[in-house]
Amino acid sequence: PWAGSIDVVSGGFPCQDISTAGKRAGIDGQRSGMWKHMARVVGEVRPAFVFVENSPALTFRGLGTVLGDLAEMGVDAAWGVPSAADFGAPHLRERIWIVARHPHQGDERAKRRVQDSGPDAGRVRADPSGWWATESGVGRVADGVAHRSHRFAAAGNGQVARVAAGAFTLLASRLKPNVF
């Protein structure tokens, strides 16, 4: 019932079996094996885009499975392992990111939504000083949690929102036809 009505399926399946700090069982491990359920959802929903995040160790503990499953569904994919430092953060925090899309599905709709998603949509780089500001540049005293910060909770504790946005933009631009 969801086919064609969902634009993006995004997620990071558990990495405990993939990570070098974990059990190293790979993508067929008890926890990381959740990929097969994410793949099932992608196959049933057929979103315009799929956005996946995981440990960079996925490159040798299951990336072939993920890309193969996506290819079997007729989905084009691009992947990379950017770090938070690549987007201006003062720490490394490498993650693998995969962006996939169904060819010719949602081209104009997706492009319009990304372009119209707000004034910060195209900003991926941090302040040129190399450090991200903790206070607003408006010249007032902070009196609580920043506006819209609750949205970042959906990304998880280990994610840097600018990296996710930058990875999506970079990888989606590699797919044909080019969305950006």
Where are these regions (language model features)?
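Short, hydrophobic alpha-helical segments
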Residues: F168-V179
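Class I S-adenosyl-L-methionine
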Residues: P1-V8, C15-A161, N178-V179
